[in-house]
C-alpha cells in the first residue's frame, strides 16, 4: 500500500465484506420471499383473479427487504476511507458485524414472508377472513428485518470509536 494509507491494511477487507454481506443476504431474502409468495399469488389468481391486487402485499413486503440491505451497504461503504482517516480492525469488524446483522435478519425475514405469503394468499382465496391474520403475521416477519437494520445502524456507528483521533 502507499505511504498515505492510515490504519490497518487488512481492515477495509472486513468492512467491504460487511457491506457485501448486508446486500447479498438481504437480497437473497427478498428474492426468496418474492418468488415464494409470487407463486402463491399466481396459483391463487387462477381461481380468484379479482383478488390478485389484494394479494400482492407479501410480494411488496419481501421486496422492501433488499432496500434494508442497500441502506446498510451504503452506510458501511461511505465509512470506509482509510486515506481520509485511520481505519483499524475494530472498524472493519464493526462494519462486518453490521452487515451480517442486517443481511441475515433480512434473509430470515424473507424466508418467513415467502412461506407465510404463499400459504396466506392461497388461504385467502378460500376464506377471505384470513387476510387480516396474514397481514399481521407478515408485519411481524418484516419486523425481524427492521430489527436487523436498527442493530446494523448501531453497530456501524460504533466504527471509529475505538480511538481518540
From Swiss-Prot:
GO terms for cellular component: proton-transporting V-type ATPase, V0 domain; vacuolar membrane. It is a multi-pass membrane protein. The record marks 142 as: Essential for proton translocation. Higher expression in leaves, followed by roots and weakly in flowers. Expression in leaves is light-dependent. Signal peptide: none annotated. Residues 34-55, 118-129 are cytoplasmic. SUPFAM superfamilies: F1F0 ATP synthase subunit C. The keyword Iron does not apply. The keyword Hydrolase does not apply. Keywords: Hydrogen ion transport, Ion transport, Membrane, Transmembrane, Transmembrane helix, Transport, Vacuole. GO terms for molecular function: proton-transporting ATPase activity, rotational mechanism. Proton-conducting pore forming subunit of the membrane integral V0 complex of vacuolar ATPase. V-ATPase is responsible for acidifying a variety of intracellular compartments in eukaryotic cells. Necessary for the crassulacean acid metabolism. Belongs to the V-ATPase proteolipid subunit family. V-ATPase is a heteromultimeric enzyme composed of a peripheral catalytic V1 complex (main components: subunits A, B, C, D, E, and F) attached to an integral membrane V0 proton pore complex (main component: the proteolipid protein; which is present as a hexamer that forms the proton-conducting pore). This is V-type proton ATPase 16 kDa proteolipid subunit. It comes from Kalanchoe daigremontiana.
